[in-house]
């Protein structure tokens, strides 16, 4: 895996991935923690579920255009445009914080996710280009580990700063009051987006525009592209089954994230957002460890034997989770869920990228997000 860091452009690529995930997660943490402080019970769970839905919806609606763009244009160019969009959106988010516009900031979660819907196929499609076919699994392991570290960092940094700011302003009792205090966090989002933009221009370009066919909006709205793209991702059984496996995993992960704060509050009697985020972070630590292990075990090949091991680990831990009543035990279970998840997803992602033709990889990766 070390040899990848000697490849020109790989370090800027990894650093850019870190900042992208850090920014996307940071805004979500601010909104989620505000919801957690103001609302409780069913309302709290419903609003957190809506936040997660806003993050997922663009990946469904933008499946066809995101795949088309990732196929047509060099991936670094797509990531550069996405980085420009991130700067613009984080500026709007910071303005909403300053004005105390909670619901506008809430809605901008959808816009930020829309940017990610275009960014994601380019990001994963670039792994094969920069790491090479022989190191595709190792590249996936590093990318997943980096993204996970960024998520963990975002959880801790934004939750810590959120709690620290509120501790000195105990009179903030409404979403608007809380957001007005979060201007420094908005500035942090903007600053990271600017650095991400600079790094995006350090990525080497390996391909040229390879698809001159225009994107027809009418066919998009009539579902012509959708039917054709679904047929594309189902052409190869290995790719389709890998996508189904990843969709199942991420569906479980989203459900777990949505209900865990309420579970921690009512079952574990834990009301501190930092502590709750720390337990969720244990899952992230596990994913990071599992991804690195999977990447190391898959040097110069894809170790598919890790897939059933990961699946059994996830199922066992999720079955045990409702029976525990202690914070430490819960954290350990979440850690094992994460390790199992890393072992599960790295071979599946690698299989998709390895099996598909280069000219269709953008569509397949966007389809993976869509499913």
Description of each model-found segment:
Residues 14, 18-22, 26-34, 165-186, ...:
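A single, central transmembrane helix in multi-pass transporters
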Residues 84-100, 312-326:
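C-terminal ends and interior cores of transmembrane alpha-helices
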Residues 72-86, 296-312:
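Cytoplasmic membrane-interface "Motif A"-like loop-to-helix N-cap segments
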Residues 11-29, 51-70, 74-89, 104-163, ...:
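Substrate-agnostic recognition of the 12-TM MFS/MFS-like secondary transporter fold
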Residues 1-11, 203-244:
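Juxtamembrane intracellular "pre-TM" segments in multi-pass secondary transporters
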Residues 125, 129, 181-217:
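Helix-loop junctions on the cytosolic side of multi-pass membrane transporters
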Residues 99-104, 147-200:
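Helix-loop-helix hairpin linking two adjacent transmembrane segments in secondary transporters
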Residues 304-345:
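C-terminal transmembrane helical hairpin of 12-TM major facilitator-type secondary transporters
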